[in-house]
């Protein structure tokens, strides 16, 4: 289970939480402009946009969970188990395996508008990376500073949906998630007025009562509502530090604590990492479950003209500043 969000202030920010019961050794990874992407059905891509994101590197290949390219386009894959279904290879189509979708789009496209044209010809196939890495059932949030879309491949084909909320979680399919927000249109950051009955002297006895009914559980539909409400009502300031901090607070609204979501006896889903990339500047910030200090990796401080990946292992231990 995961949550992703796109957030526009003075700069454009894109990030996500990764919620799962175990880590796969992911690290912050920069793919330079001349790293040779070898696609299973579409040949090689030897020159492309550089990108930065979180990836598990297997056999020298970056399996990106989320990434942002140097043009400011961001993309994240989130679990879509039970609904995701991929096609068979078809002649005359751009046959791209699901694990290749992030580099296929981010390597070639600078905007969502450009990506839409690519997606029109896309045939998303279930070719696995290897026998050890079967095709993951995913859907994707794709966003730039101007718009966001959700990409879902299902039994009835490939869908690209406008996402005015700029957020994504997991099941059910995106149209149901967006429609469900109708049930929460009365939520407000302001204190409510008594509309129950003029015959009763009802009054607010606490701050925050305008958001009564905002779901607080960890299910994906509830997290969609909560992160959308938090993001769309968040107040922004002027500095990079303040905006990055605010983005982490937005995703903190859906953070999962170890012990609250048991997936099997003794195994618990929790927020392994939270990311926030300033897509305008190419700076990737993250925290981990046991380290709340922000760590940053700058795309433009890496070697971008070479062919070799650059990776940084996550700082996972808590960093405590002692004041005395």
Each language-model region and where it sits:
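A contiguous strand-loop segment
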Residues: 1-94, 126, 311-315, 322-324
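Proteins synthesized as precursors that undergo proteolytic processing into mature forms
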Residues: 92-128, 240-249
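Broad, structure-driven detector of short, well-ordered beta-strand segments within folded domains
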Residues: 28, 68, 149-153, 275
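Beta-strand residues in well-ordered beta-sheet regions across diverse protein folds
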Residues: 15, 76-78, 151-152, 285-287
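Short, surface-exposed beta-strand-loop junctions and turns on beta-sheet-rich folds
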Residues: 20-23, 81-83, 156-159, 166, ...
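Catalytic cofactor-binding cores of redox enzymes
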Residues: 121-159
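C-terminus-biased signal that marks the final domain/tail of proteins
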Residues: 1-13, 49, 128-130, 135-136, ...
């Amino acid at each position: 289970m995961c949550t992703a969000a796109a957030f526009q202030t003075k700069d454009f920010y894109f990030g996500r939480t990764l919620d799962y019961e175990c880590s796969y050794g992911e690290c912050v990874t920069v793919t330079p402009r001349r790293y040779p992407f070898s696609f299973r059905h579409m040949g090689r891509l030897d020159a492309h946009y550089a990108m930065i994101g979180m990836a598990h590197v297997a056999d020298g290949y970056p399996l990106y969970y989320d990434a942002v390219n140097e043009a400011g386009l961001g993309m994240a894959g989130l679990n879509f188990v039970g609904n995701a279904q991929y096609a068979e290879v078809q002649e005359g189509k751009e046959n791209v395996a699901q694990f290749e979708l992030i580099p296929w789009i981010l390597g070639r496209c600078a905007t969502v508008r450009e990506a839409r044209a690519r997606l029109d010809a896309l045939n998303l196939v279930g070719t696995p990376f290897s026998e050890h890495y079967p095709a993951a059932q995913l859907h994707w949030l794709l966003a730039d500073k101007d718009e966001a879309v959700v990409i879902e491949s299902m039994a009835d084909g490939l869908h690209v949906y406008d996402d005015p909320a700029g957020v994504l979680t997991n099941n059910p399919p995106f149209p149901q998630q967006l429609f469900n927000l109708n049930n929460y249109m009365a939520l407000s950051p302001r204190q409510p007025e008594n509309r129950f009955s003029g015959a009763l002297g009802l009054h607010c006895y606490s701050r925050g009562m305008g958001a009564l009914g905002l779901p607080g559980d960890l299910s994906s539909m509830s997290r969609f509502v909560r992160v959308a409400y938090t993001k769309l009502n968040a107040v922004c300031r002027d500095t990079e530090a303040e905006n990055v901090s605010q983005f982490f607070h937005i995703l903190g609204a859906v953070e999962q604590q170890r012990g609250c979501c048991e997936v099997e006896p003794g195994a618990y889903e929790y927020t392994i990492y939270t990311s926030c990339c300033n897509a305008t500047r190419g700076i990737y910030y993250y925290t981990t479950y046991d380290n709340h200090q922000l760590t940053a990796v700058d795309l433009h401080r890496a070697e971008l003209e070479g062919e070799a990946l650059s990776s940084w292992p996550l700082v996972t231990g808590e960093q405590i500043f002692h004041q005395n």
